[in-house]
Design a protein with these regions (language model features):
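Select subsegments of transmembrane alpha-helices in polytopic membrane proteins
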Residues: 1-10, 50-55, 115-125, 146, ...
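Multi-pass membrane catalytic core of lipid/isoprenoid biosynthesis enzymes
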Residues: 1-31, 106-141
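Intramembrane alpha-helical segments
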Residues: 1-74
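C-terminal ends of transmembrane helices
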Residues: 36-49, 94-98, 156-166
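Small-residue-rich segments of transmembrane alpha-helices in multi-pass membrane proteins
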Residues: 53-70, 110-115, 173-190
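Alpha-helical transmembrane segments
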Residues: 74-87
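Acidic (Asp/Glu-rich) catalytic motifs at the cytosolic membrane interface
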Residues: 85-110
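Extended hydrophobic alpha-helices typical of membrane-associated regions
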Residues: 140-194
C-alpha cells in the first residue's frame, strides 16, 4: 500500500510540475530534478556516504520551484539555504532511528558519524541556513530576522547544554529541530517565497 501511495504522489507531483512548466522549461527541470533526487535516496544512496545528497538537492529544488512558478529568478542564497536545510534535516532525522537503521544494514553518512556527530553536523548546517536567511536577501537584515537568529542560537545552546548526557540526548535533538522550525519561519515570514 505504501508503494502505491508513493507512486500516486509521484504521479501527482509530475502532473503538477508538467502543468506548471509547460511554457517554462526551467520549472519543469527543477521539479523533475527534485523528484528524481528524492527517489534516489531509497536506492541507491541511503546506505552510502552520499545519503545527504538527495535531501540537499530536493530541499534546494522546492523553494526554487515555487519562485520559478511565480515567474521570478531564483536567488543563489535561497537555493543554498534550501540545500543546507535538507542536509541538516537528514542528519537530524537519522538520530532517533539510528539503532534500528544499523540493525537493518543502513549505514549512511550520519550513521558513520554517530549520534553526537550527526547532531553537530545538523546544528552547524541549520545555523548556516539561519545566517543565509537573515543576510541573504537584499537590504539590511530585518528585526524579525535578528530576533529569530538569536532564538535559534539560544535554542541550540540550551539543547546542547541539557543534552550533554547521552540519557538526555533527545534535548539536543529537540534543539536542532527547534532551529529547523526557526529557519522555516524565517523563510516564510521573510517573504523569500513571495
Amino acid at each position: 500500500m505504501r508503494r502505491i501511495l508513493a507512486a500516486a504522489m509521484a504521479c501527482l507531483a509530475l502532473a503538477v510540475a508538467t502543468a506548471a512548466g509547460a511554457d517554462r522549461p526551467w520549472v519543469f527541470l527543477v521539479a523533475w530534478l527534485g523528484l528524481g533526487s528524492a527517489l534516489s535516496y531509497d536506492w541507491p544512496l541511503k546506505s552510502t556516504v552520499l545519503s545527504p545528497l538527495p535531501y540537499a538537492v530536493s530541499f534546494a529544488c522546492l523553494p526554487a520551484f515555487v519562485v520559478l512558478v511565480a515567474g521570478h529568478s531564483v536567488p543563489a542564497w535561497l537555493v543554498l539555504a534550501g540545500g543546507l536545510l535538507g542536509f541538516g534535516a537528514h542528519f537530524a532525522n537519522v538520530v532517533p532511528d539510528m539503532a534500528d537503521d544499523e540493525a537493518t544494514g543502513v549505514r549512511g553518512l550520519p550513521h558513520r558519524l554517530g549520534a553526537d556527530g550527526a547532531l553537530a553536523v545538523s546544528a552547524g548546517a541549520l545555523l548556516a541556513v539561519t545566517a543565509l536567511l537573515i543576510f541573504g536577501p537584499p537590504g539590511p537584515p530585518r528585526a524579525f530576522g535578528a530576533a529569530a537568529g538569536a532564538v535559534a542560537v539560544v535554542v541550540l545552546l540550551l539543547g546542547a547544554f541539557v543534552g550533554r548526557r547521552s540519557a538526555a540526548r533527545h534535548w539536543a535533538f529537540r534543539g536542532v529541530i527547534g532551529v529547523a522550525l526557526v529557519d522555516v519561519a524565517l523563510l516564510i515570514a521573510g517573504g523569500a517565497l513571495q
